[in-house]
Amino acid sequence: EVCRDKYDAVLPLVRLLLHHHKLVPFVAAVAELDLKDTQEANTVFRGNSLATRCVDEMMKIVGKHYLKVTLKPVIDEVGYSTETVFRALSPLGNHSDVNGLKKYLFSQLQENLRYYVDKVFREIVRSSISCPTLMCDVFYSLRHLAAKRFPNDPHVQYSAVSSFVFLRFFAVAVVSPHTFHLRPHHPDAQTSRTLTLISKAIQTLGSWGSLTKSKLSSFKETFMCEFFKTFQEEKFTESVKKFLDDVSSTESKEPSGVSEPVHLKEG
């Protein structure tokens, strides 16, 4: 074990490494150790290891502005809208044709959800130019370490990056915008449900590869399986691949991502 009490140690450790510009080589070193214990390519960086926790904390610190310019406008739209995905599903009991109304509202639900998922997905895959250089450098390192560990798997270089930038960064920010300072307060129950579905959609679309039957069957909601069949197009996969290529390249984008001095201790 590199660190027995890694959860308490991670945040101050990341702050210290950022302050001394040593985070990238440290993450590379602990990620390599992590990969040595990983037996299957499809489980790369999926656990709560020291490496994954360090990258998580780094993204929260370095990626604040990136999240704001990429997601805040559409998150605000979901939050302020009077017609969020589930808002119209309230009292149906007094309607003369409850089943007919349910069918109509169900179609509206899918329509609205598709609109928001499309918009969030589009904003993300167009955002690579805004991704902080430090995040790109970390992703570049993780990508090549994963490819080295599993040389016969052509997809692992992408899943190594998507497991962070989609699953642990964008999807988490969508479902909990208040914790990333994208919204001032915890969303109400209906908005929260909408954001949860959008987040789940982004996780699925961000997973490298096609939307297989096994992925579709993992949804508890039957309508989500039908919903995702509309995304089974090569253009979505290619958009994700290009985005992952861009954010894991060494080409300079945003100067550093750390616009303010890193505080070694809070309070």
Predicted regions and their residues:
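Extended alpha-helical scaffold/tether regions of large eukaryotic proteins
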Residues: 1-267
